[in-house]
From Swiss-Prot:
The keyword Iron-sulfur applies. It is an enzyme of class 4 (lyase). Signal peptide: none annotated. The active site is at residue 473. Belongs to the IlvD/Edd family. The gene is ilvD. Its cofactor is [2Fe-2S] cluster; Mg(2+). This is Dihydroxy-acid dehydratase. The modification N6-carboxylysine is found at residue 125. Pathway: Amino-acid biosynthesis; L-isoleucine biosynthesis; L-isoleucine from 2-oxobutanoate: step 3/4; Amino-acid biosynthesis; L-valine biosynthesis; L-valine from pyruvate: step 3/4. HAMAP family: IlvD (MF_00012). The keyword Amino-acid biosynthesis applies. Mg(2+) binds at residues 82, 124-125, 447. It catalyses: (2R)-2,3-dihydroxy-3-methylbutanoate = 3-methyl-2-oxobutanoate + H2O; (2R,3R)-2,3-dihydroxy-3-methylpentanoate = (S)-3-methyl-2-oxopentanoate + H2O.
Length: 557
């Protein structure tokens, strides 16, 4: 039986003789035209350490596809570095790159009639971009995560890239020496691999194990390790088998499997960006999913992993402690996962977890039993109020009291806010408002890691609030609320905030409120005028014209 269900459209028959001529130029033989064509979407790039170690994974996948009797077809996908673009205009391209990656994969797979695709990626937007594409095209696919970076070390302390961001605030506050500042800078990123805490890349890759679209244990392996190469090869072999079975993404990505993925995100203390990305993945798979679903899951799934940014450990520690399968086994035994969901292996999630211990190892402190959870409920809360009628996202772990009422300090761009923080013009009790940074207004919802890390570095993490219609890095923690919708650019209430207005953030009551009476807000609304778009040409202008609101995943199609 042949399994080239799709590629036969461009390899078979008299009319396709010119096509075969071109394949012969690539080294194909006559017998190859009856084999499935498997795409390898290779995100390798020397732009960022997140992607600089992907070539050997892609090479391993290519070899495994050949060994499995299929034809590998490698093509490139773009990336930008969220960490390097942070705090600059370049960060506006980050979320846009999610859409570009999805479109690139769709274009190549559909244009070339590939029978399946192995997606290999590393930096933050690579994961949702790839999964959006797989859900959209519904061609057999698997996700291979590039793996995490190893932690850095300086004077007995473990470091991640967030250590460098927070050091900026500490150094400018006089709380860190020049020697330590440079020591952190030089040692925070010692290897290739994605940022090491439960930040966005590790959040999304971990959730893909629960979603059923990546192999177990693959998300917490370190990029430099041989087991990561071996896992990439095994992923490719599994994908070829999925092609033979005609097992497609939408057989795996269901509302129940998304609930599994989000449950793991809650249990591990994952990134706020996961809210945006799973709205987009669900949209691509044509699944009914809303921000209210996140809140529903948050209320029943505890945080059981002590992971950075609000905890102590990093992804390599989680891997040594049993990885995501150990987390999932605890959740499954507690009735918090759907064990009957299909996975890319052709087995159910429960079958995949059958041999995982029911109790975490006693010699580790990363994964806690359910009855010893760090927090009884999840950490990604959906806040509403007159400042966010359509919702906003807050990360509420790591704080002694996630409640603040204080005067608004209003900024219409990130650079002005960062300067105010570093110049000590932001004080305890203030609520920083960063606006006109939403999907349309930014455009692209840039991440606010630079100002939030500066607040932490200044020692104000527990006493200063920050709200924005932009996003936060997975490395952010503190009294922060993002994804405010409606955004300022379309006239959301956040556009009406004035310097000194009283704002309340209350994560206990799930409230984000501007304490100004309705009559005054009505007067301000009449006077408000939409600003001119920041960009009128190029990819940012295209994105701004197409982007949906944050509460709909900020998708473009």
């Amino acid at each position: 039986m042949s399994y080239n269900r799709r590629s036969k459209n461009i390899t078979q028959g008299v009319a396709r003789s010119p096509n075969r001529s071109m394949y012969y130029a690539l080294g194909y033989q006559k017998e190859d035209f009856d084999k499935p064509m498997i795409g390898i979407a290779n995100g390798h790039s020397t732009i960022t350490p997140c992607n600089a170690g992907l070539q050997r994974l892609s090479d391993a996948a290519v070899a495994a596809v050949k060994d499995a009797g299929a034809n590998p077809q490698i093509f490139g996908t773009p990336t930008i570095s969220d960490g390097m673009s942070m705090g600059t205009e370049g960060m506006k391209y980050s979320l846009v790159s999610r859409e570009v990656i999805a479109d690139c994969i769709e274009t190549c797979v559909q244009g070339q009639w590939m029978d399946g695709v192995v997606v290999v990626g590393g930096c933050d937007k690579n994961m949702p971009g790839g999964m959006i594409a797989l859900a959209r095209i519904n061609v057999p696919g698997i996700y291979v995560y590039g793996g995490t970076i190893r932690p850095g070390h300086w004077k007995g302390h473990d470091l991640t890239i967030v250590s460098s961001f927070e050091a900026v605030g500490e150094f400018t506050a006089g709380r860190m020496s020049q020697e330590d500042f440079e020591g952190v800078e030089k040692n925070a990123c010692p290897t290739t691999g994605s940022c090491g805490g439960m930040y966005t890349a590790n959040t999304m890759s971990s959730s893909f194990e629960a979603l059923g679209m990546s192999l177990l244990y693959s998300s917490t392996m370190a990029n430099p390790d041989q087991e990561k190469v071996d896992s990439a090869a095994e992923s490719a072999r599994v994908l070829v088998e999925a092609v033979k079975k005609d097992l497609k993404p939408r057989d795996i990505i269901t509302k129940q499997s998304i609930e599994n993925a989000v449950s793991v995100i809650m249990a591990t203390g994952g990134s706020t960006n996961a809210v945006l990305h799973y709205l987009a993945i669900a949209h691509a798979a044509e699944i009914d999913w809303s921000i209210e679903d996140f809140e529903r899951i948050r209320k029943r799934v505890p945080v059981i992993c002590d992971l950075k940014p609000s905890g102590q450990y990093v992804a390599t520690d989680l891997h040594a402690a049993g990885g995501i399968p150990q987390v999932m086994k605890l959740l499954l035994d507690a009735g918090l996962l759907h064990g009957d969901c299909m996975t890319i292996t052709g087995r159910t999630l429960a079958e995949e977890l059958k041999d995982v211990p029911s109790v975490p190892r006693a010699d580790q402190k990363v994964i806690h039993p359910i009855d010893q959870a760090l927090y009884k409920e999840g950490h990604l809360a959906i806040l509403k109020g007159n400042l966010a009628e359509d919702g906003a996202v807050a990360k509420i772990t790591g704080l002694k009291n996630p409640v603040i009422t204080g005067p608004a300090r209003v900024f219409d761009d990130e650079q002005s806010a960062l300067a105010a923080i570093l110049d000590d013009r932001i004080r305890a009790g203030d609520v920083v408002v960063l606006r006109y940074l939403g999907p349309q207004g930014g455009p692209g919802m840039p991440e606010m890691l630079a100002p939030t890390s500066a607040i932490i570095g200044k020692g104000l993490g527990e006493s200063v609030g920050l709200i924005t219609d932009g996003r936060f890095s997975g490395g952010t923690w503190g009294m922060v609320v993002g994804h405010v919708a409606p955004e300022a650019f379309v006239g959301g209430t956040i556009a009406l905030v004035q310097e000194g207005d009283s704002i309340t953030i209350d994560a206990h009551k799930l409230l984000l409120q501007l304490n100004v009476d309705d009559a005054e807000l009505a007067r301000r609304r009449v006077a408000w005028k939409q600003p001119a778009p920041r960009y009128t040409r190029g990819v940012l202008a295209k994105y701004a014209a197409l982007a949906r609101p944050a509460n709909q995943g900020a998708v473009t199609g």
